[in-house]
């Protein structure tokens, strides 16, 4: 009997020790498109796990187009679902309505908030709730091929979208490249981001007297420019099927003189190992309709804790690490840091002076896409109608009126 008691006690102590040393397992959802690469996120996570051996992070990567639906579909999974998710600036209204993310307002100190760019914080806040930490501070820039512009005899950078089109026409006429412009116009959120960049540059907003409006002069001007650039042979028609990576590859291959894309393309297009135009890449704020004006879309994203997570403290520990200033500074070549003082760091600035100069202008004029709990439905309609225009199936006026009608029915 004594041996039996001692045996049970030993087993209990072994089980307790095993329980005490067992790592908490987190499930984290990321995307495989733009900003940080999958290999970079894995490297960040491995460093976190090394510093925190009691936490194990299981990573899942999906295309951006699948990210939203993955988060929504997992809401009933409870502790078996995701703990940490990457979310876009356009989803907080919907995620608040359906309680998909935990409010972490109490976890972020006032000191941290003061050190983060306001535009980045806005990405994760809705109706007074903070749904995560900003992680990707991003917008779209106008990239240009310096060698092509020089060969065309273009000595000054375009200051307006009209000048971009004029320069593109010169480049085409001189047969330097067949299609000087390339965009992300596939029927996806990328199309909405390009459209929003143009609307911003033309001085537009999406709300008129508190109501959504897509038939404003700025909106119609944006859509007409998109269509005319195709009709005039300036935009590569394949743009209607392109996402951001397609744009990067086309530009890096020397198949375009101008491209609209996120931050991550700057250093990748300047990398001789994966680009034929390394050293020829220029970057500037997307222009507007008058010299001195710029346009930009808020393409920032945050990391949040799923409502069903049973490991909120460890999830926050991981998020805090991933969004920390040292980690962001170390990976600043693919996504600029959310921390203000990072831009005084010589390592962050190195070889990125042109990018950061452009960011200084663009990040201050970012236009947010409409904040509505029904954003996914609205975006789907907008994508469809824009594609109708780009393929010649509808006029800009008719297409945007159709979007207005759909927007009026949103809850």
Regions found by a protein language model. Name each.
Residues 26-43, 62-64, 138, 189, ...:
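Extracytoplasmic "Venus flytrap"
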Residues 119, 123, 281-285, 332-384, ...:
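Long, aromatic- and glycine/proline-rich binding clefts that accommodate carbohydrate-like moieties
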Residues 43, 47-116, 123-125, 150-159, ...:
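Extracytoplasmic "Venus flytrap"/periplasmic binding protein-like
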Residues 92-100, 120-156, 184-208, 297-306, ...:
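Periplasmic solute-binding protein
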Residues 167-170, 174, 211-240, 286, ...:
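Glycine-centered hinge/linker elements that transmit conformational signals in sensory
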Residues 88-141, 163-167, 179-180, 191-194, ...:
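Hinge/lid segment of periplasmic solute-binding proteins
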Residues 46, 50-51, 130, 150-152, ...:
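Extracytoplasmic/periplasmic substrate-recognition and gating elements
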Residues 105-116, 180, 185-186, 201-223, ...:
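Short, solvent-exposed loop/beta-turn-alpha elements that line the ligand-binding surface or hinge
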């Amino acid at each position: 009997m004594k041996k039996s008691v001692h045996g049970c006690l030993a087993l209990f102590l072994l089980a307790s020790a095993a329980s005490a040393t067992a790592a908490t397992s987190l499930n984290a959802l990321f995307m495989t498109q733009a900003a940080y690469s999958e290999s970079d996120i894995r490297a960040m996570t491995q460093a976190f796990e090394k510093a925190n051996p009691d936490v194990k992070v299981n990573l899942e990567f999906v295309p951006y187009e699948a990210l939203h639906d993955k988060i929504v579909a997992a809401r009933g999974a409870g502790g078996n679902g995701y703990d940490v998710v990457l979310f876009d600036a356009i989803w907080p209204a919907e995620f608040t309505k359906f309680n998909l993310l935990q409010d972490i307002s109490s976890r972020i100190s006032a000191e941290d908030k003061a050190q983060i760019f306001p535009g980045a914080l806005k990405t994760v806040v809705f109706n007074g709730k903070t749904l995560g930490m900003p992680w990707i501070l991003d917008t779209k820039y106008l990239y240009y091929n310096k060698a092509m512009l020089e060969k065309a005899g273009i000595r000054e950078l375009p200051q307006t979208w009209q000048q971009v089109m004029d320069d593109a026409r010169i480049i085409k006429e001189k047969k330097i490249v067949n299609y000087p412009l390339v965009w992300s116009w596939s029927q996806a959120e990328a199309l909405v981001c390009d459209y929003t960049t143009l609307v911003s540059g033309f001085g537009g907003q999406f709300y008129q007297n508190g109501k959504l409006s897509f038939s404003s002069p700025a909106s119609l001007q944006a859509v007409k420019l998109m269509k005319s650039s195709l009709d005039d042979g300036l935009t590569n028609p394949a743009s209607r099927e392109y996402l951001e990576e397609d744009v990067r590859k086309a530009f890096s291959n020397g198949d375009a003189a101008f491209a609209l894309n996120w931050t991550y393309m700057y250093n990748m297009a300047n990398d001789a190992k994966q680009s034929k135009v390394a050293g020829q890449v220029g970057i500037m704020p997307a222009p507007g309709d008058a010299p001195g004006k710029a346009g930009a879309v808020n393409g920032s994203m945050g990391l949040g804790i799923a409502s069903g997570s049973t490991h909120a403290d460890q999830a926050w520990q991981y998020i805090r690490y991933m969004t920390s200033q040292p980690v962001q500074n170390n990976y600043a070549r693919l996504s600029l840091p959310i921390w203000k003082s990072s831009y005084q760091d010589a390592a962050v600035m190195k070889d990125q002076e042109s990018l950061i100069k452009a960011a200084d202008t663009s990040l201050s004029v970012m236009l947010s896409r409409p904040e509505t709990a029904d954003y996914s439905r609205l975006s789907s309609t907008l994508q469809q109608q824009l594609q109708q225009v780009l393929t010649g199936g509808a006029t800009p006026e008719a297409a945007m009126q159709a979007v207005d009608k759909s927007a009026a029915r949103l809850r």
